[in-house]
Amino acid sequence: MNRSARRRLTAAVLTVVAVTASATACSSDADDTSTKAEGGGTYTIWDPYPQFEKGSAWAKLLDGCGTEAGVKIKRTAFDTSDLANKALLAAQQDNSADVLIVDNPVVSTLAEAGVLTTTEDNKLDTSKVSPNLLAAGQSGGKTYGTPIGANTLALYYNKAVLKKAGVDISSVTDWKSLTAAMAKVKKAGKKGITFSAIGTEEGSFQFLPWFWGSGAKLTELDSSQAVSALSLWKKWLDKGYAPNSVINNTQTTSWQEFASGDYAFAENGTWQLANAEKAGFEYGVIPVPGASGGDAAAPTGGEFVTIPVQGDTGRYATSQKLVSCLTNSENLLETDTTLSYVAPTTEVQDKQVAADAKLKPWVDAVKAAKGRTSDDLGTKYPKISEQMWKAVQSALSGSASPKDALGSAQSAVK
């Protein structure tokens, strides 16, 4: 590996730390599992699912794909934030995994560091993948993997709270009607909405649906549309529709507030579905509305299945077989159900909704979703995101107006 490539990898290690800060996966020690197959050698797969131990459906799927390809699989599972750095260090040592399943925002960082091969290189078929989801794995006009599934944000609502306030959820179609619903809820003695505005990537993740829903672009943090989005959040705090605790809320603590039964709405993700079923009250889900109606684009979460660069190019053909097996329609349905993900293809999404009608609003939200590193932002995104969450913190705490906070953010990005 030449010196310029090593410099790119070293810089990428620093970038990855910022991008993976919003990871919500469970932490765990690495878990190695392997399965035997006739001949063909051993192929390594790294994934961010330490919660799935040896003997789990996920581990069995990996084993099965290895058997189908005629090779032995050695699997290592890491916490999401650890995995990206491990992948970069392995690349520096020319010891990359054969297949790497990684959080979608860091794909562009790994790609620009020269760690990943393109789908064109390895003839991976991504033709059925929804373009908005595939975009999260694209950089410089090239695609560096295929999504295994996606999660995103939407609005959970408490049916009893809205009924008591006389709010028909079908009337909530834009920011004006959503705010009006919160006013009725407050008048009825309950609370409007909870979300996470914490000063980390998690806060940016939660702000993005409102930012994009205003028509704003990440290259113009100080646009009038962006100011309107931050002003909306500030108004909710000033009116008492949202609690001051949102400034420090993570998505977990925000959910705990909603689970108390006192709130009409909560912005949260598909990963809370199991908790929603245990909340003890009837709930519903709607996509985050755009400023003037329609569904706002929410940021996509979820992982990409990628093939890292290898010194032995003869390994790519088998790696391609493994990735194709992991992401075929039959296996995607099982895997995405296990992960509480929405599938990346319309074909499998339809099957998910047919099996569970409650997934429909999530499928709709994913169809409107957008990758944080899309629009060729790539490694520029972490710096933009940091200035965004700082602006949100500044405005909501009252230390600066939304306009001034975003103006400072844009100046810092340039």
Task: Give the location of each predicted region.
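Extracytoplasmic/periplasmic substrate-recognition and gating elements
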Residues: 165, 238-242, 277-339
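Hinge/lid segment of periplasmic solute-binding proteins
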Residues: 103-152, 179, 206, 286, ...
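Long, aromatic- and glycine/proline-rich binding clefts that accommodate carbohydrate-like moieties
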Residues: 337-387
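Conserved N-terminal structural module of periplasmic/extracytoplasmic solute-binding proteins
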Residues: 2-107, 290-292, 314, 318, ...
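Extracytoplasmic "Venus flytrap"/periplasmic binding protein-like
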Residues: 66-131, 163-166, 264-265, 275-276, ...
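Short helix-initiation/N-cap motifs at beta->coil->alpha
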Residues: 77-86, 105, 173-179, 245-259
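Periplasmic solute-binding protein
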Residues: 110-115, 133-170, 198-218, 300-308, ...
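Glycine-centered hinge/linker elements that transmit conformational signals in sensory
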Residues: 182-186, 219-247
